[in-house]
UniProtKB/Swiss-Prot annotation:
This is Phenylalanine--tRNA ligase beta subunit. Residues 708-801 form the FDX-ACB domain. Belongs to the phenylalanyl-tRNA synthetase beta subunit family. Type 1 subfamily. Binds 2 magnesium ions per tetramer. It comes from Geobacter sulfurreducens (strain ATCC 51573 / DSM 12127 / PCA).
Length: 801
């Protein structure tokens, strides 16, 4: 934000030096990033008069001039053609240093001596462009420094504002802060509007179809305007704050924008169909040409200003080429409105169109100042463009905004800041900020915040206001009063750390992905319309469309991370993430947020090495990782059942992980189409476990059992079972016998083919026996083994081979 000292002084009485004012603003939280003096160091540029002008003898385009500076008459060579003898001009005398470090010296130009230079506005830093030298008013005294004579000496402050301080995006806003700090009252500009003629309602009609995005829309009608250049004072004031003069009408809207901080827009009323304004959302795919001549494609979420037939402006951002102010414009419809900040931000960001107007609406304009800014601009247009303001004002304001009231505790504020201010002292500070207060009871105040302070919502915000206005430098340094507790992790945190250590120990790298995802990510996962993970929590104002909803699964984030790494030629990946997902609960305001452990594997089983075979990962590798996790948390009795519920897995190459009736998660190879959708062209294996359920299924640590001192013995069984019988059912059947001497049972061979009937498979199981009391003999093992065989035959329909 750029402000000038002279402009600030119009609203607040202030005699601080430039340095003092800069320090004051910075201590108020308005950081001064730069200070520039206008006219500083230009005391050698004075008012002079051209006594004589004649042609240069050696150059057709140069003139020899006799110039009187009030003390002496100097010879000056000048190339400008826009002056005559008798004109008062700006003379840069010998020794003057102009902007750009241009030093004026005595010189000879085409053989003639020149003892100075007649200056243009551009050469003095008063304008970006100029034609010829400055011609000054005839009543200015000779020899007086130019910037003193014209009152142009000024100081420009460049202020870096934080996004929450929308109220300071104006000269009045900054002046209000200065007045509050100095304990003075701000003087607002007068804006008495002289109205005449027909009422405005007979000149124009305004319809707001979307009051949610446009809570307030006001307008005035000014007829008989004459478009032309703005007066010098207005041009210079705009240029001082970095704005280019266009014409008197546009300059007035820009002037009020910088003065009040509220954007306005002027339409050529004769170009509006039926003199009608309709505020509504754009048609999806609509093409609209803005003032900069660019064609922009709109969406149904963009708010537009339309006339009776077409869009004429992008609400709060930029006007349209089809209704702009032209040299022939005579009748003007002047708009002053309040638009929803989120809607303006989304449209401006999507279109890549950032303007002074959108900058202010995005941060939150003042809905209460709409008519004041409108009247100020209308009064200036009547004065500077000769317009006639129609009687009345159109004000569409269906639901007036109420002032926010915040409960404030004096003791709490003192405790937080380490100060000792009384309630009356704090109330005085609030009154300086134009807040109103009501004492509810001793030490408790209800503070009503004006609408221009959209950033104040909670008690702590008011505490900050007290700190700012009372002075950060008045807060004494004290030791914090706090009880120190040891930072012991909770049991849940210890389990999370243990899980991460386990995954790293298995060769995985932890990744942290965004908690948001694109809605299209679920389509790329091929989830069906009835899948609960499609019921997402949407963000009201996402930063980007790719992060518009909260994630319901960790898979998209891991796949995108894998895709990026594969593009970098990291072909062997093991990634995991232990984070929350967000599942919408019907009838609940907040989603369920379970903690989920997910892992992704792709590439080779072992790192590249001279002694390692290049075995690719397969289903059993990812299953082994899940088994290791379950073992680490002492989850016993886990089962793996084939299940094609999750369509993002390869059919027949996935399973559901259960502990009893509790579903812990799933694992398997991803569907090739899902891999393609994420730009991956090699097999990917994935698992996902609900960490909360995993912990609930975990057993308490069991007592240490010393290993047996006696040798083991084993027996192998080869059986035929149905093709769909999981091998895990065989092991589970043996474990279910609860025979104390059975140490372990494991499948070591699987065979299908010759001598095995269709629909059957041959599985070999090794059962290991051991006693903790003695060495088992064959006679003791045989009956135990027979029980195993009988159980397999009875429960699984197995045939012994």
């Amino acid at each position: 934000m750029i402000v000038t000292y002279n402009w600030l002084k119009e609203f607040v009485e202030c005699d601080l030096s430039t340095q003092e004012l800069g320090d004051l603003l910075t201590m108020l939280g308005l950081e001064v990033e730069g200070v520039r003096e206008v006219g500083g160091g230009l005391d050698q540029v004075v008012v002079a008069v051209v006594e004589e002008r004649r042609k240069h003898p050696n150059a057709d385009k140069l003139s020899l001039c006799k110039v009187n500076n009030g003390r002496e008459i100097l010879d000056i060579v000048c190339g400008a053609q826009n002056f005559t003898a008798g004109d008062k001009v700006a003379l840069a005398q010998i020794g003057a240093v102009l902007p750009g470090d241009f030093k004026i010296k005595r010189s000879k130009i085409r053989g003639e001596e020149s003892c100075g230079m007649l200056c243009s506005e551009r050469e003095l830093g008063l304008s970006a462009e100029s034609e010829g030298i400055m011609i000054l008013p005839s009543d200015l005294p000779l020899g007086v420094p130019l910037f003193d004579a014209l009152g142009l000496k000024d100081t420009i402050f460049e202020i870096g504002l934080t996004p929450n301080r929308a109220d300071c995006l104006s000269v009045i806003g900054v002046a209000r802060e200065i007045a509050a700090k100095l304990g003075k009252r701000i003087t607002y500009p007068g804006h008495a509007v002289v109205e005449s003629g027909e009422p405005v309602t007979q000149k124009a009609t305004v319809i707001v179809e979307d009051p949610e995005l446009c809570p307030r829309y006001t307008a005035r009608f000014i007829s008989g305007c004459s478009i032309g250049p703005s007066p010098a004072w207005l041009v210079r004031r705009l240029e001082a704050v970095g704005m280019r003069s266009i014409n008197n009408v546009v300059d007035v809207t820009n002037y009020v924008l910088m003065e009040y901080g509220h954007p306005l827009h002027a339409f050529d009323a004769d170009l509006l169909e039926n003199s009608t304004i309709v505020v509504r959302r754009a048609t999806d795919g609509e093409v609209f040409t803005t003032l900069d001549g660019q064609q922009r494609t709109l969406t149904a979420g963009d708010l537009t200003i339309r006339d009776g037939a077409r869009s004429v402006a992008l609400a709060g951002i930029m006007g349209g080429e089809n209704s702009e102010i032209r040299d022939t414009t005579t009748n003007i419809l002047l708009e002053s409105a309040y638009f929803n900040p989120s809607a303006i931000r989304r449209t401006a960001k999507r279109l890549g169109l950032h303007t002074e107007s959108s900058h202010r609406f995005e941060r939150g304009a003042d809905v209460a100042i709409v008519t004041r800014a409108l009247d100020r601009a209308a009064a200036l247009l009547a004065e500077l463009a000769g317009g006639t303001v129609a009687a009345g004002i159109i004000d569409v304001y269906p639901t007036p905004v109420s002032h926010r009231t915040i409960r404030f505790r004096v003791d709490r504020c003192n405790a937080l800041l380490g100060v000792e201010l009384s309630a009356n002292e704090m109330k005085a500070l609030f009154h300086h900020l134009e807040f109103t207060t009501v004492t509810v009871e001793p030490g408790i105040i209800d503070v009503t915040v004006p609408t221009f302070r959209v950033d104040l919502e909670r008690e702590i915000d008011l505490v900050e206001e007290v700190a700012r206005l009372n002075g950060y430098d008045r807060i004494e340094t004290t030791m914090p009063r706090a009880r120190v507790f040891s930072d012991r992790p909770t049991k849940h945190q210890r389990m999370e750390r243990r899980c991460r250590d386990l995954m790293v120990g298995q060769g995985f790298n932890e990744v942290i992905t965004f908690s948001f995802m694109a809605p299209g990510a679920l389509d790329r996962m091929m989830l069906g319309p009835e899948d609960g993970r499609r019921s997402v929590v949407a963000l009201r104002n996402p930063l980007v469309d790719e992060q518009a909803v909260m994630r319901t699964t960790l898979l998209p984030g891991l796949l995108e991370a894998a895709s990026r790494n594969l593009n970098y030629r990291s072909l062997d990946l093991r990634l995991f993430e232990l984070r929350r997902v967000y599942l919408r609960v019907e009838g609940e305001q907040l989603p369920n947020e379970p903690l989920v452990l997910a892992g992704l594997m792709t590439g080779r089983r072992y790192p590249e090495g001279w002694n390692q075979e290049k075995h690719p990962l397969d289903f059993y590798d990812v299953k082994g990782v899940v088994e290791a996790v379950l073992d680490a948390f002492s989850v016993s009795g886990a089962s793996y059942s084939s299940d094609d519920t999750d369509v993002f897995y390869h059919p027949g190459k996935s399973c559901t992980v259960k502990c009893g009736d509790l579903i812990l998660g799933s694992l398997g190879e991803l569907h090739p189409d899902v891999q393609d959708n994420f730009g991956i062209d090699q097999p990917v294996f994935y698992f996902e476990l609900n960490f909360e359920r995993l912990l609930s299924a975990a057993r308490a640590a069991s007592a240490v059992v010393p290993p047996s001192r006696f040798p083991d013995t084993f027996r192998d069984i080869a059986i035929l079972v149905a093709d769909e019988t999981p091998a895990a059912d065989i092991v589970r059947c043996i474990d279910g016998l609860r025979i104390r001497e059975i140490e372990s049972a494991a499948v070591f061979d699987l065979y299908k083919g010759v001598h095995v009937p269709e629909g059957k498979k041959s599985i070999a199981v090794r059962v290991r026996y051991r006693s903790t009391e003695k060495t088992l003999s064959d006679d003791e093992v045989s009956p135990l083994h027979q029980k195993v065989v009988d159980s397999l035959v009875a429960k699984l329909g197995a045939t012994i081979r």
